[in-house]
């Protein structure tokens, strides 16, 4: 794992020592090279003899998320260029450094073997994200958003630390690989029930579960483009990854403890999809759509069948790429029109026809059209939830219809209609932006040719 962690850390001196006109090109090309080397991890055996150490390891569950994290850094750097055009040189370098620090922490988090190291990295990702949101966001409300983000996630994950110390006392170890084989079932005592809640709460806030989701739209809307991308694509997946890792250790409590959370996530899925239909703010709409997609993942993980686990991992990867692409598109609109309100940005298809193609592709992947990887994830999760309980098919069906509705609503509001008079002199789209969109779409389409590499350890 060090062959990814060390080069990523060395991107920091590279950024600070680069010549002024080479900051972007140096950091982007080198991070792209690192992300290409990370693709070697896909060629993996089940026994992990190749990349196992006492501190860092990777298995078929963490590998796809790891590669998604590394793939996203060059894309974030490409997306941020015009956002930072008027900033001073030190601030540009600081911004890039923050992104690199965040990426390093995320790599260490996805590959940690010890639960405490996992927890420390889980918390440490808050700091660079908070700095990115509160320093480079667009409106003044970013301070409020940063506060929400910090306190929701901190208060959610403090009980996890207590639960981990309790686990250490009862089992004598906090190693993932040992605890997976620790077969003693937990008895349903009060202390164990509280431990279950403490373990799950941190990840449910991060996912976010409906009801604990209020920080997400705020943070997304106020963050700069790179902040939104990394928040949607990777930071929400920390919750899913943590749940997938820790549910193995909490058997058989999850079977009866999960019911209220399952109901809440299935209901929240419908609610947040419906909220999307009433949004005027483009970024807010995409943020709420992430909440509804992640609710499906929560439900799938809590059911705990092999199919639902596979569907959850596939859906997490697919959603990471899709929502990141939607935020990039929203940002390219914002840079030209300087407003996130959809009514002010309509009729853009006439001015930017090639961008309209990307908008169409992104909307279709968002509503899980074949042959994208989103379809595979949704099929597996919907089928496993249906076989767990038949009446849920009504909730699922409603959700799929509403998802299609808001995706098409977003497409039609931004691309069709009579364009408003202040859009007459907008700048044409750049090659950089088209490359950015292509680098989001190509993995989505290629993964559908060979989806088994992202279906997790149970495939």
From Swiss-Prot:
Tell me if Membrane is a UniProt keyword of this record: yes
Pfam families per record:
Oxidored_q5_N, Proton_antipo_M
Q: Which UniProt keywords apply?
A: Electron transport, Membrane, Mitochondrion, Mitochondrion inner membrane, NAD, Respiratory chain, Translocase, Transmembrane, Transmembrane helix, Transport, Ubiquinone
Membrane-spanning intervals of the chain: 22-42, 60-80, 92-112, 113-133, 147-167, 193-213, 224-244, 256-276, 284-303, 308-330, 350-370, 393-413, 435-455
- Which top class of enzyme applies to this chain? translocase
Q: What is its main location?
A: mitochondrion
**Reactions mediated catalytically:** a ubiquinone + NADH + 5 H(+)(in) = a ubiquinol + NAD(+) + 4 H(+)(out)
Q: Which GO terms describe its molecular function?
A: NADH dehydrogenase (ubiquinone) activity; ubiquinone binding
Q: What is its EC number?
A: 7.1.1.2
GO CC, sorted alphabetically, is: mitochondrial inner membrane
Give one GO biological process term.
mitochondrial respiratory chain complex I assembly
Top-rank taxon of the source lineage equals Eukaryota
The way this protein sits in the membrane is described as: Multi-pass membrane protein
| Subcellular location as annotated | Mitochondrion inner membrane
Function statement: Core subunit of the mitochondrial membrane respiratory chain NADH dehydrogenase (Complex I) which catalyzes electron transfer from NADH through the respiratory chain, using ubiquinone as an electron acceptor. Essential for the catalytic activity and assembly of complex I.
Q: Which family does it belong to?
A: Belongs to the complex I subunit 4 family.
Per UniProt, subunit arrangement is: Core subunit of respiratory chain NADH dehydrogenase (Complex I) which is composed of 45 different subunits.
This protein's name:
NADH-ubiquinone oxidoreductase chain 4
What taxonomic lineage is listed for the species of origin? Eukaryota, Metazoa, Chordata, Craniata, Vertebrata
